[in-house]
Amino acid sequence: IGFFNYRGNFHMSNYAKEERLTGGNVSSVYRSENTVRRELKPGSEKIHKLLQHLENKGFHYAPKFLGVDEEDREVLSFIEGEAGNYPLKEYMRSNDVLKEIAKMLRLYHDAVSDFPLLADWKPMDHTPNNIEVLCHNDFAIYNIIFNNEKPVGIIDFDVAAPGPSLWDIAYTLYTC
């Protein structure tokens, strides 16, 4: 299907038909077979390191960073399912789903507890000073992927930044 060149870039041997995915408020997001393609942004390299760290820690809820394609787009693994887009389906608002989302967030915080925070990775505006972890900062229902009525993934790490774990917890409760 594809291969990595000597620079670690991902190349497709045959262009697969791409499907534009819904969402992607900041950039266009495309699916090509079992991958997602998104344009690179300032800070993408940091997010790629984060995704690699999560994979190494066994956090299977995040997409895997696979490389950069010939069009300078990041290539991520596709998480099968549907995003929690509005209007929410009834099951997405259940107590059981909220408990599973809370577990997923806890596992994320555990996985990033030893992630090295680079000096140039600044907290978001108005973040409280007690930095504990690399917060996702958008752990919201619309970034959670559901399959068989269960949360199976979290996407969109673009605004991840250092902060207190309670910052992520409060935002998740507010948006879920």
Provide a role label for each language-model segment:
Residues 57-67:
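Conserved HxN/HPN-centered segment at the entrance to the catalytic loop
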Residues 150-176:
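Active-site Asp-x-Gly
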Residues 1-11:
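Short, Lys/Arg-enriched N-terminal segments with co-localized hydrophobic residues
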Residues 16-52, 86-87:
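ATP-binding glycine-rich loop module of kinase domains
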